Amino acid sequence: MANAKEIKTKIASVQNTQKITSAMEMVAASKMRKAQDRMASSRPYAENMRKVIGHVAQGSLEYKHPYLEVREAKRVGYIVVSTDRGLCGGLNVNLFKKVVADVKKQREAGAEVEFCPIGARSVQFFNSFGGQVSAHASGLGDAPKLADLIGTVRVMLQAYNEGKLDRLYVVFNKFVNTMSQTPVIEQLLPLPKSEEDEISHHWDYLYEPDPKELLDTLLVRYVESQVYQGVVENIASEQAARMVAMKAATDNAGELISDLELVYNKARQAAITQELSEIVSGAAAV
């Protein structure tokens, strides 16, 4: 058993760690609320844009945009959104596992894959994973802007336009609630059809000035908005996961301190008992 002084030093060390994790928990909670506000603001736009584009994909236009044409998936691209920092539980690990499982299926089907990692952890992982990394972005901060992503996303769009990609997906952690964040893979290109219009499609939009001019701009904007929404959702998920992880660390530190204090008291009691025994033995000898 360690002596009382060593145990006391250990208790002080754990208490200092507990203060740090408690502070990180509070910071993460504050950042999560801000991230939730940004997510709530952008989510209706992204969801409605998805519905509109899904309806367009069901339509019978004379002009067929390349993003509406389904091609054989010989080469698949993934835009993978992760965090820049750690200390957020298994958030990134679970995301990467999902991507790796999907990549395995694509490769078994004979497709080649390439990646566009967003976030330092994603960049680090896919640089060592294998497969072409066509573009990347990191250091976006807690309040990213769409302009920060446009250059990276358009590298993948250019590859799709040139026929170097036949499928394009975005992968991120979808924020469900504070305790639950789910890794998802969503198809960006070719445009997925709207589930609501899958059974019946009895109306269509009127396009002004003409479908080509409108769709050439709208469809690019759609892809950018979906990636941005993925980034915003991932940030909210990151802060929620970090808050939960830091709370667990703080609680564990508290339990460890209690256990160490018990050990300290036993060690102190043993030392006192030893001293008393020595005193009694000395007195008896006299």
Swiss-Prot record:
- SUPFAM superfamilies per UniProt: ATP synthase (F1-ATPase), gamma subunit
Asked if the Swiss-Prot or TrEMBL record annotates the protein with the keyword Mitochondrion, the reply is: no
- InterPro entries of this UniProt entry? ATP_synth_F1_ATPase_gsu (IPR035968), ATP_synth_F1_gsu (IPR000131), ATP_synth_F1_gsu_CS (IPR023632)
Q: Which GO terms describe its biological process?
A: proton motive force-driven plasma membrane ATP synthesis
Taken from the UniProt entry, a GO cellular component term is:
proton-transporting ATP synthase complex
The Swiss-Prot or TrEMBL record annotates one GO molecular function as:
proton-transporting ATP synthase activity, rotational mechanism
Superkingdom of this protein's organism:
Bacteria
Kindly give the membrane topology term recorded for this protein: Peripheral membrane protein
Where in the cell is the protein located? Cell inner membrane
Just give the chief location class. Answer: membrane
Q: How does it assemble?
A: F-type ATPases have 2 components, CF(1) - the catalytic core - and CF(0) - the membrane proton channel. CF(1) has five subunits: alpha(3), beta(3), gamma(1), delta(1), epsilon(1). CF(0) has three main subunits: a, b and c.
Q: Which family does it belong to?
A: Belongs to the ATPase gamma chain family.
According to its UniProt entry, what is the function of this protein?
Produces ATP from ADP in the presence of a proton gradient across the membrane. The gamma chain is believed to be important in regulating ATPase activity and the flow of protons through the CF(0) complex.
UniProt-recorded name of the protein: ATP synthase gamma chain
